[in-house]
Amino acid sequence: MTRRIVRTISQLGALLVTALLFVFLVDTRYRLLPHAIHTQNFLHHPGLIVTDVTLTTCSSLNPLSSCQLDSSKWHRIEKDLYLHTGWVSSAYLHVQRKREEELTADDKVVVDLRVGRLDPGVGEKGQQQEQWESRPGNIWLLRSNKKKDSDSDRAVTAVDVLFGADAVDPRPGWSITQTPLLLDAASRLQAARITIRHGPVRAEKKDVVPRIRKDGKFKIIQLSDLHLSTGTGSCRDAIDANGDIKGNCEADPRTLDFVGRILDEEAPDLVVLGGDQVNGDTAPDAQSAIFKFADLLISRSIPYAAIFGNHDDEGPKATRLSREAQMSLLSTMPFSLSRPGPDNIDGVGNYYVEVLAQSPSQNSAITLYFLDSHSYSPDEKTYRGYDWIKPNQIQWFTETAQSLKTQHAKYTHIHLDMAFIHIPLPEFAMQGNLVAGGEFREPSTAPGFNSGFYKVLKEQGIVSVGCGHDHVNDYCALTPQSKDAANTENVGPWMCYAGGSGFGGYAGYGGFHRRVRVWDLDMNAGRIVTWKRVECCGDDLKKRIGELLIVDGGRVVVPPESG
């Protein structure tokens, strides 16, 4: 009797498994299962599926032309494909989308998109059996009415537009077309390229946790003033080994090649983007510029944290991307530690990053503070030049630093605190500063108003503050009282310029080669050594330029002599 029951249960179980398997197989084609079950199945990605793509052009001379389609059916990507450079013409990409559960038997989903003059079904190997559909701008769509395709990684689920011959898309699951859209001669300078995402939205990026290496070391590279453009950009003040101005060159490829080489040679644990990553006036699509430096870091799996300079959000109102929008984009990118910070204080990008001790410890070993130094003076008549760190930022910093001290005391070695801003503090411009490890080539363009932030940094135990902005300065400095200080506990913090990294920004001043600043931290000794790496030339390519010990045993080190 017992055997019969067991046999019956086994047979029913096998039948149930077979039935479920059959239902799931049929569902891949005919969608039998309810949406609630689909959402639990990793093969499904509920959300918007692209069913069509088209391009519209319009002319301000023709009142009957329009770049708007029926908004109940089409979503317009809000980027003029001419980047507002067309005298009378505009063009926009439109995408038709449906939710997966709303697809009918008559709907087709886009599974591939190409751009080219020839039908991929005729000109490409392996595509002869496919029925490609043409759209304006030399767009070709491959669409499918098979239900299983809407549930697979074949389905196109998002479309975007980037610009420039050097455009890249580092977002997971996205791929960019190699051929630009065919518009007309007016758009050739900044070619518009479609980029698409196949399959579901990838899992939200996991927070990157920077950590001290097993040997107790941690290395930071500070990139300042990259001045990247939409498209390749034009070099400014590019010189050769003899100091002679070189001919025309493309700024961004040269900048990225230089930075990529240093990243590979120095192998940093973290990159600080010190502001003016984007050269607003030559970057009508800031997203394309941002993706170029992000790709450089994401492809190498290097965590990075960014602040803004005065040029990042410049440019014509029609095309410029606000600080808020840029930070929103950056904060979602892989390996990014960038954050907008509290929305009740001035600026965008006031935040801190904790670098943890060696695994498995969860204690902080280093705290890096990032603050928005804003842009131009809000009171040009009284204080000419640039803006300053605001009182509510200083209050936020002070309260944050004090709140972390108890937790930091749990670290078994010496905890170190550093800060990064873009525009130098007024103390950078003080007469009689003790200058070391670099050159003072141009006057400091610090704010005319001193809000007292340097004093607060000192009170809270910050050992160094790095800045950019003045491209051809690359020195470190201590305030004048450091020269005669009897107690080094009252000295500092060090103020260090990074030096300009990008060929899209100015240089000159008697011959200046682009550079980056390296911060090498040895937590076993509470020590920081810093130097620069340069883009040119000869033996200097491998040298540590202006190497300087600035902190030892957790205390600021005063060098024996300046220079």
Indicate where each model-derived feature is located.
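Extended active-site neighborhood of metal-dependent phosphoesterases/phosphodiesterases
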Residues: 180-212, 292-403, 407, 516-518
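His/acidic metal-ligating clusters that form di-metal
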Residues: 266-269, 361, 367-370, 381-480
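Acidic, histidine-bearing metal-coordination/catalytic regions of metal-dependent phosphoesterases
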Residues: 1-244, 536-553, 558, 562-563
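Beta-strand-turn-beta hairpins that frame and shape the catalytic cleft
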Residues: 210-221, 352-370, 478-495, 525
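Active-site environment of divalent metal-dependent phosphoester hydrolases
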Residues: 227-232, 279-282, 306-318, 377-379, ...
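Divalent metal-coordination and catalytic microenvironments
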Residues: 225, 259, 271, 276, ...
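Acidic/histidine-rich helix-loop elements
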Residues: 227-254, 278-285, 381-386, 436-442, ...
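Active-site-proximal beta-strand elements of phosphoester/diester hydrolases
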Residues: 217-230, 365-379, 420, 493-500
